[in-house]
Amino acid sequence: MAGSSQRTASKLEFLEGSRSGIRYDPDQLRGTDPADGRTLLARYDLASARDSLTLEAIAARRAGLWRWEELLPVRRRSSITTLGEGATPLLPPARLASKLGLRGLFIKAESVNPTGSFKARGMAVAVSRAVELGADHLVAPSAGNAGGALAAYAAAAGVRATVVMPADAPIANQQEAALCGARVILLDGLISDCGKLARLIAELSGAFDMATLREPYRVEGKKTLGFELAEDFDWALPDAVVYPTGGGTGLVGMWKAFDELQALGLIGAARPRMYAVQADGCAPIVRAFEEGSEFAEPWPHAVTRAAGIRVPSALGDHLILDCLRRSGGGAIAVPEVEIDAMQTFAAREGAGYLSLESSAALAALPFMLERGLIGADERVALFDTGAGFKSEAPSMERPAVVSNDPGAWPDVIASLNDAKVPDPRRPI
């Protein structure tokens, strides 16, 4: 974004410990709460923001994440680093919804963000704010998409980036981060192990740790999902939100957004039921929810091909669980085989090439419908958090190579009539 030294309309007032409640100066570069090591959350002068954030004013602004500048932390326009993130479409997947028995299903297509996933939102705001406060080297652990987004926005801001990924992170994500100029370190371990190395890098090199909920501002970018959802539904929130959950920043951010929108008078008190979906091979939030725990114990031997939700331990676990419970929602684990099946099924029913994480969320819907967690006529918003081509490639037969001899082509054409139609049955 072409900028100047002109100030934004940000109404940022202070940072607050998510558990301690202690307030901190927001104009110093901070990570977690010094009191307890938990997440810091940005707080705004909402009474002042109410004067300028009216429905009419919002509608008149340029589409995109930064139209919500009163409720974002960046102080100067020259500090904003943007690649055009936000303003993603809310799509009604008619054929898929019909097959799943849901007449009010909508998919928020975050895969159209500039780095191919919802991670662009968080990194756009967090990188902008970190650089504004003096950071010149950023480091983060990543299962894939966050690393690519950090690398892209760091490059746009002109600062260094280091990304620590599990060695089995999807190749597309490794290539994206490296191509954008980040130093990519592949670690023989899980995302939690990558987080430990990233923290050590920050400690020894002076880099700023951008890990999920270990700094205050990625959640501020992610909360724009909630702002847009309210606007997409004409300021009457859907009945339920279904979200593939690893670190949980999106859920935490949306819940924060709904609180802020209500304080501004833009929505009422009604909230969607929030549902976290995880793979059954890595479901710490599901287990903690079912056990009634405030925190989630680390999940041992985490296994799932959906790299973005292979998070054995989330720093924001208490925030995620609080959101689920306060909303009357829940947490669902789906079998790995159903994730793979749903990715293919959804694509063949016209929903596009969705990520494995998004496919996990879709795979939960038949179970939720059967158990009465959602109704066939309810408005359900599901988040497509990333593009399918950035996930681990599915196991599929390579199409046969056809001879370039025109004499063989009639047989090829005739074989098209023998092609099997995909089985339209639900995968669960």
Positions of predicted regions on the chain:
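PLP-dependent amino-acid enzyme catalytic core
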Residues: M1-I428
